[in-house]
Amino acid sequence: MELIRRLFTAALVAGVLSGTAASVVQQATTVPLILEAEKYEVVTPPPAPAVAAPGAAAPAAAESHHHGPVREVGEGVPTTLDEAMQRIGLTIASNLLTGVAYALLLSAAMLLAGRPVDARRGLVWGAGGFVAVSLAPSFGLPPELPGMAGADLELRQLWWLAAAAGAGVGMAALAFARNRLVIAAAVLATALPHLVGAPHPESAEGAVPPELAAHFVTASLGSAALFWAILGAVCGWLISGLVGEAEHRPALRVQPGAR
């Protein structure tokens, strides 16, 4: 019971620290990009050109050339201070919950591995989490801004789970497995989602400018890397004592003839 309590305490501390740091960074990097992209969510088509006489076709074409789609502010853009603060609060709460959940998984994996761990080794564990959860899935499904074209949500979620699980299994096999067949199977599991391909819409057209989308991908991966670095280092530092206790815990011995 003491082990579980300390495990949850370590996960809570690591999750709060990493979630808070990610929230601060996102307010300066990804959130402004999201707000900018939401301005492109509502697009009013340009007015249809009026049918004119053959002699007026050229002026009409020239006039229609200067009229493009009218951009309007999307409904998700906060217009008051209360709405903005509410969005910030929801972002922080989401990051904190996500941090605690991932910290529990990472701490449990450290204990199950049974290897010595500290803040430095925890940083390596955090790098593995970043690769599995953020980097590997981004090769097929990079972070998307509002207003970008996307395939069916359920298909994307299933592919993301397969890519993240495959990357995690592959790295675990490379780090701990000794059987070559196991390693080969794990590598195949890592590559399989990417060989099948991520689900994409039939048309990649979207209202968001490509340079804005590319900037968002790099900013999102950067904040995710910071999140996992803090998460792994803090988890490793706090879990180090638990792993040491588990290694030196005396095994239960049964005396001959005892019942």
Regions found by a protein language model. Name each.
Residues 1-259:
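Juxtamembrane/disordered regions of integral membrane proteins
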